Amino acid sequence: MKILGIDPGTKNCGYAILEKSKFKTILLEAGLIKIKPNTLQYQITELCEGLDLIFKNHKFDEVAIEDIFFAYNPKTVLKLAQFRGALSLKILQLHGDFAEYTPLQVKKTVTGKAKADKEQVAFMVKKILGINKEIKPLDITDAIAIALTHANNLRIN
């Protein structure tokens, strides 16, 4: 089963592709859709074009995305919500249904602690998948954690 995990952001959008079998989970690919500073419309276009490319190169059984987190800056929340809306529409067009997980759900699944920081998540992602090299930036490890959370949720259900 091939799972795409997506960590939406306004500067970078992390993505990770996992192959899950009955006995193991393998990281096939992970990276960033880089979003250059520009008008919101062009940034959303870049995000959607990046997602198009990922779906053009892969077929997925499942897609999971991180839900919007709480932020203190209303402008940031509004921009992220617009990115998230465009991303949701694009995923529905390219794939269909997708799963959503809050940051707390992802942290709890991967580290066992809902209040874990990004470095703890990155450490556990590498440990779970048996990866020895550093994975940067943290947007990528977050995307992997989202995919792992979905893989775990599928196993439970």
UniProtKB/Swiss-Prot annotation:
Reaction(s) the record says it catalyses: Endonucleolytic cleavage at a junction such as a reciprocal single-stranded crossover between two homologous DNA duplexes (Holliday junction)
Keyword Metal-binding: yes
Subcellular location: Cytoplasm
Keywords from the named record: Cytoplasm, DNA damage, DNA recombination, DNA repair, DNA-binding, Endonuclease, Hydrolase, Magnesium, Metal-binding, Nuclease
Active site per database record: 7, 66, 139
NCBIfam families cross-referenced by the UniProt entry: ruvC
Biological process annotations from GO: DNA recombination; DNA repair
GO cellular component: cytoplasm; Holliday junction resolvase complex
Assembly: Homodimer which binds Holliday junction (HJ) DNA. The HJ becomes 2-fold symmetrical on binding to RuvC with unstacked arms; it has a different conformation from HJ DNA in complex with RuvA. In the full resolvosome a probable DNA-RuvA(4)-RuvB(12)-RuvC(2) complex forms which resolves the HJ.
InterPro entries recorded: RNaseH-like_sf, RNaseH_sf, X-over_junc_endoDNase_Mg_BS, X-over_junc_endoDNase_RuvC
Organism of provenance: Campylobacter concisus (strain 13826)
Name of protein: Crossover junction endodeoxyribonuclease RuvC
Broad class of the protein's primary localization: cytoplasm
Binding of Mg(2+) 1, residues: 7, 139
Taxonomic superkingdom: Bacteria
EC number of this enzyme: 3.1.21.10
